[in-house]
Design a protein with these regions (language model features):
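ATP-dependent small-molecule kinase phosphotransfer cores
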Residues: 27-121
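Conserved lysine of the Walker
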Residues: 13
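Hydrophobic positions on the alpha1 helix immediately C-terminal to the Walker A/P-loop
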Residues: 16
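Hydrophobic alpha-helical packing residues
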Residues: 20, 24-25
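Walker A (P-loop) phosphate-binding loop of P-loop NTPases
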Residues: 10
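Hydrophobic anchor at the beta1->P-loop junction of P-loop NTPases
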Residues: 3-5
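The start of beta-strands in P-loop NTPase/AAA+ ATPase cores
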Residues: 1, 87-88, 127
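A glycine- and Lys/Arg-enriched "phosphate-lid" helix/loop adjacent to the NTP-binding pocket
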Residues: 98-163
């Protein structure tokens, strides 16, 4: 089974994914906890490319291609092999985040995101939990924890307006 958690930054996706993995492992299930962007060595390299440096160095289209490449590597090297081995895969983010942030917040590129997903990924989660919360609260929590993902806060704020 492939389970994903989606929601804005600071909504508790990582915490809830970890709690679910711990709960299932405590009941004897073999689980794999992962994240996007990233989750495999190649996808982590792409994550660094996107998160570090000048945020305007990539066009929206190039960024979509990078995220799709990272997801493809993640799918090939971790998700599919784990599912094939009978494990439950729990991911902090997957394609819905790309559909929202790159597909809508950086222009009307949803069609491109969907086409690339169909061609290169071709998999949807079996179950997605969407964590809904006040955007201001989530962003405040994300900023308070720090880390290297401030690069997307502006895009995420714009996405909240679109929603």
């Amino acid at each position: 089974m492939f389970i994903t958690f989606e929601g804005i930054d600071g909504s508790g996706k990582s915490t809830q994914a970890r709690c679910l993995a711990d709960h299932l492992e405590g009941r004897g299930f073999d689980t794999v906890l992962t994240r996007e962007p990233g989750g495999s060595p190649g996808a982590e390299e792409i994550r660094r490319l996107v998160l570090e440096g000048d945020p305007d160095r990539w066009s929206a289209e190039t960024e979509i291609l990078l995220f799709t490449a990272a997801r493809r590597d993640h799918l090939e090297r971790l998700i599919e092999p784990s599912l094939g081995a009978g494990k439950i895969v729990i991911s902090d983010r997957f394609a819905d985040s790309t559909r929202m942030y790159q597909g809508l917040s950086r222009g009307d590129l949803r069609g491109l995101v969907d086409t690339l997903h169909t061609l290169m990924i071709g998999r949807e989660p079996d179950l997605t939990f969407i964590i809904d919360m006040d955007p201001d609260t989530g962003l405040a929590r994300a900023r308070a924890r720090g880390g290297g993902e401030e690069r997307f806060e502006t895009d995420h704020e714009q996405a909240h307006i679109i929603i």
